């Protein structure tokens, strides 16, 4: 059975809304990537070294990342040889299969959010300004509420003009309380208040916003360390998630940001925003494979429910949906 057929069976068991969101959200990447792959397989009669060289360029242009592309091409060559594949069209299914394998290989890291019943779950959102961090917090609060959890938001970005007000708008929109102080206050003090407010309300989840820019990078990272210490002191083993918000449209720049933040704080997962706004959705694989950080959330559109938990099969379906849907029944 081809991988596309297996994927089709798995996707049909999912709720339609999830698979459709990945399909819609990855439309730009799919159109660009699939068109290039279709063009490639139509021009070649056989799978040879020239074919793989061109495929390499297609994958790099999708921001899959050089190291990951080299690994993927090596795996494809072995698989093509093992299965004695001659027809370039048959390689498409193998590409999708290997993309899922590469994402799932390596470090055993869980893609699901670390949310457990019977405790206050503390989620810290970090990232530079302009990547959609506050919007992600608002959408995540909505998602948690839809799942029946009580949520509190902490307006820990006291530095950026308008950040507190922006979070308050999301609080009103989602019906979630926002704990805040005045602009310029000590972020650690805001988080301290928020932890106690969340405990007093017996909340399930506390989501904390943080500054994305201070006078310099050293100050920003020190601020994050201080906030983390406050959380650790008040809630043992917290924060349970430190999610780094990255803008998918910035490509390799996002990789550089991830490296910087990983040095300063223990990033447990990536919230990849604006994936619907780029034709270079391969960044997901580069982050996972080269930085060894799982992508936990993806922004697939403008709507409040367009933030989804990342799933590698749904992602590959989004890239190859036209071919998956044509798979033999």
Curated annotation (Swiss-Prot):
It catalyses: GTP + H2O = GDP + phosphate + H(+). Gene3D superfamilies: P-loop containing nucleotide triphosphate hydrolases, Signal recognition particle SRP54, nucleotide-binding domain. NCBIfam families: ftsY. Involved in targeting and insertion of nascent membrane proteins into the cytoplasmic membrane. Acts as a receptor for the complex formed by the signal recognition particle (SRP) and the ribosome-nascent chain (RNC). PROSITE patterns: SRP54. HAMAP family: FtsY. This is Signal recognition particle receptor FtsY. GO terms for molecular function: ATP hydrolysis activity; GTP binding; GTPase activity; signal recognition particle binding. One of its GO terms (cellular component) is plasma membrane. It is an enzyme of class 3 (hydrolase). Part of the signal recognition particle protein translocation system, which is composed of SRP and FtsY. Its EC number is 3.6.5.4. It is found in: Cell membrane; Cytoplasm. GTP binds at residues 127-134, 209-213, 273-276. The keyword Cytoplasm applies. CDD domains: FtsY. Belongs to the GTP-binding SRP family. FtsY subfamily. It is a peripheral membrane protein. Keywords: Cell membrane, Cytoplasm, GTP-binding, Hydrolase, Membrane, Nucleotide-binding, Receptor. PANTHER family: SIGNAL RECOGNITION PARTICLE RECEPTOR SUBUNIT ALPHA. GO terms for biological process: protein targeting; SRP-dependent cotranslational protein targeting to membrane. InterPro entries: AAA+_ATPase (IPR003593), P-loop_NTPase (IPR027417), Signal_recog_particl_SRP54_hlx (IPR013822), SR_rcpt_FtsY (IPR004390), SRP/SRP_N (IPR036225), SRP54_GTPase_dom (IPR000897), SRP54_N_sf (IPR042101).
């Amino acid at each position: 059975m081809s991988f596309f057929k297996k994927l089709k069976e798995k996707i049909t068991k999912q709720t339609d809304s999830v698979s459709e969101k990945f399909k819609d959200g990855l439309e730009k990447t799919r159109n660009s990537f699939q068109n290039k792959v279709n063009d490639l397989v139509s021009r070649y009669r056989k799978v040879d070294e020239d074919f793989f060289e061109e495929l390499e360029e297609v994958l790099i242009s999708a921001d899959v990342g050089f190291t990951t592309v080299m690994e993927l091409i090596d795996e494809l060559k072995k698989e093509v040889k093992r299965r004695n594949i001659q027809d370039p069209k048959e390689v498409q299914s193998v590409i999708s299969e290997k993309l899922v394998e590469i994402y799932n290989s390596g470090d055993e890291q869980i893609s699901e959010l670390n949310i457990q019943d019977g405790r206050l779950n503390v989620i810290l959102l970090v990232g530079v300004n302009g990547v959609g961090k506050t919007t992600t917090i608002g959408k995540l609060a909505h998602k948690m509420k839809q799942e029946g959890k009580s949520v509190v938001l902490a307006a820990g970005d006291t530095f950026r003009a308008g950040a507190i007000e922006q979070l308050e708008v999301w609080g009103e929109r989602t019906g979630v309380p926002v704990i805040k102080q005045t602009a310029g206050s000590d972020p650690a003090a805001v988080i301290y208040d928020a932890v106690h407010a969340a405990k007093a309300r017996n909340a399930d989840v506390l989501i904390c916003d943080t500054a994305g820019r201070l006078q310099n990078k050293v100050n920003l990272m020190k601020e994050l360390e201080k906030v983390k210490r406050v959380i650790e002191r008040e809630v043992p083993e917290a924060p349970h998630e430190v999610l780094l918000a990255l803008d998918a449209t910035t490509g390799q720049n996002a990789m550089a940001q991830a490296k910087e933040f990983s040095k300063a704080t223990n990033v447990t997962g990536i919230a990849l925003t604006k994936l619907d706004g780029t034709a270079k959705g391969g960044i997901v694989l580069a982050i996972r494979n080269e930085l060894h950080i799982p992508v936990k959330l993806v922004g697939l559109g403008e709507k409040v429910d367009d933030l989804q938990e990342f799933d590698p099969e749904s992602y590959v379906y989004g890239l190859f949906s036209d071919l998956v849907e044509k798979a033999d029944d």
